[in-house]
């Protein structure tokens, strides 16, 4: 994969991640002045996950690292613009949720109940369910870690 293709893929990925970030920010009643920052943070988070995946990291660890990055940037922006970090981070993290894996797992459950047990369907169910669960766990833990690190009242040692 050439460098031009990687850059074009990254730009496309970041633009397409900014759109749902703004949409969910509007659903959550984020102030109008913060919408552009939600879009930018969603693009940064999804773009960083894409870069990590292109470099060879699996999607679970890439999502974890991207969520940590989103959390750190959100905390810094909340200090600059005097807003709660969740204003920026929650809407920005939603485009990284594993919708396709969860959908395939759900369809596999429906197929299992409708046509009966099949090893291929059960394998698709378990694989996609576990992948979706680990990605959601990585996103939630990764998003909460910067707050635990940066707002710690006691010394860590």
Swiss-Prot record:
Membrane topology: Multi-pass membrane protein
Stretches that traverse the bilayer: 6-26, 51-71, 87-107, 129-149
Places the protein is found: Cell inner membrane
Alphabetical keyword list: Cell inner membrane, Cell membrane, Membrane, Transmembrane, Transmembrane helix, Transport
Tagged with keyword Cell membrane: yes
Family, per entry: Belongs to the ThrE exporter (TC 2.A.79) family.
Record note on quaternary structure: The transporter is composed of YjjB and YjjP.
Listed name of the protein: Probable succinate transporter subunit YjjB
Source organism: Proteus mirabilis (strain HI4320)
Taxon lineage: Bacteria, Pseudomonadati, Pseudomonadota, Gammaproteobacteria, Enterobacterales
